[in-house]
Amino acid sequence: MGTPFKRYHIAPVWRGENPQAGRYREFVQCDFDTIGTKSNAADIETLFIIHDLMLKIGFTDFKIRVNNRMILNGLLQLHNLESQSAAVLRALDKLAKSSPEAVIQEMQEQGGLTQQQAEQILALMTAQGTTAEILDSLESQLKGNERGTQGVLNLRELFTAVERAGIPAERVVLDTSIARGLDYYTGTIYET
């Protein structure tokens, strides 16, 4: 099999979690993966596919929120917190449903972070401003960390490609709060 290998499907999938309101064990997922390349072009193509699929199925008022896990991983690396990454990511993944104080507390209790470390990570993950302002701030904070800097560069390339493709800026937004708590997320992350 040659690479990059691309796989697409829509099918029932299952998750190994306890079912709860709005989170079923079985659900239908549209999945497409590119395996065997480290090129940022694959992530940009994924974004274009998401955008085009949303239009094809009739949605016109939607947002694709993006982030890059290399940024958070780089920040954890800078603060010597890589061994606590699972606890930090689980806490950050609750930002939409929990208060910032609760997320900070969980990072401290479950990840062993200091108050200052937890606050710094939360500040980075809830950055506000234009896409360019946020990326500039991230780049400054991650200076000297190759992984985090690469994540910022990948997002800059992605947003440049979005602009060149004529996709309205309000449809693709940088959301640094998207963390995804699973280790198989390694690069660009998308949510609609």
Regions found by a protein language model. Give the residues of each.
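Positively charged, Gly/Ser-enriched RNA/tRNA-binding surfaces
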Residues: 1-60, 107-192
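Internal, well-ordered alpha-helical segments in soluble enzyme and binding-protein domains
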Residues: 46, 68-71, 88-91, 103, ...
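Beta-rich nucleic-acid/ligand-interaction surfaces
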Residues: 66-78, 178-186
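Active-site-proximal loop/short-helix segments
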Residues: 75-76, 82, 129
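Acidic, His- and aromatic-enriched active-site or binding-groove loops in soluble protein domains
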Residues: 80-108
